[in-house]
């Protein structure tokens, strides 16, 4: 595996869970430009990934100081601008998928590459869904859009490692009807 020399690029750990997967078709949020996106749920126990993201955020902040300064004379402190690394326990307390985890929303105008655990391209859409586990390649960058300042994450590529319980999905027909007693049918 190649050594990453870009301080704003992060490859997450294999226990990262994907949610809100929009990796096959770009989706418009609030009427904006359609983008490919995923919410990356990172266990708090994965301290290596969390530290890599924090380090990349600091590097993006330093690299983007001129952009973050805007028309002002000073750069706002990092703690005063939008940060992509968010605490699931605080921001999504009612969602068990985000318990004891951080999350990062990453998006891109271009489709991410999506591969399996041995780097073969995944072409079957049903193989990638909200709830799978895998690694993600993200790039962290500073932005200043109409005075809205912060650090954001671009989505580069995804590697599915293993299946997981689907998130936010409905029950399958098999699970709804597979255990019913046939004696009651049409009675």
Locate each region found by the language model.
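Beta-strand elements of well-folded, non-transmembrane domains
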Residues: 42-44, 140-142, 162
């Amino acid at each position: 595996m190649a050594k990453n020399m870009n301080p704003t690029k992060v490859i997450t750990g294999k226990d990262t869970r994907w949610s809100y997967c929009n990796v096959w078709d770009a989706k418009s949020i609030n009427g904006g430009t359609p983008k490919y996106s995923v919410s990356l749920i990172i266990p708090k126990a994965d301290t290596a990934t969390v530290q890599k993201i924090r380090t990349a955020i600091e590097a993006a902040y330093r690299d983007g100081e001129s952009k973050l300064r805007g028309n002002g004379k000073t750069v706002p402190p990092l703690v005063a601008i939008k940060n992509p690394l968010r605490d699931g326990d605080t921001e999504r307390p009612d969602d068990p998928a985000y318990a004891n985890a951080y999350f990062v929303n990453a998006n891109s105008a271009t489709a991410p590459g999506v591969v399996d655990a041995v780097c073969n391209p995944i072409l079957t859409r049903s193989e990638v869904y909200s709830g799978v586990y895998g690694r993600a390649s993200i790039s962290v960058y500073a932005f200043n859009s109409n005075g809205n300042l912060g650090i954001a994450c671009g989505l580069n590529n995804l590697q599915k490692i293993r299946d997981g319980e689907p998130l936010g999905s409905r029950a399958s027909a098999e699970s709804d009807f597979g255990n019913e007693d046939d004696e009651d049918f049409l009675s």
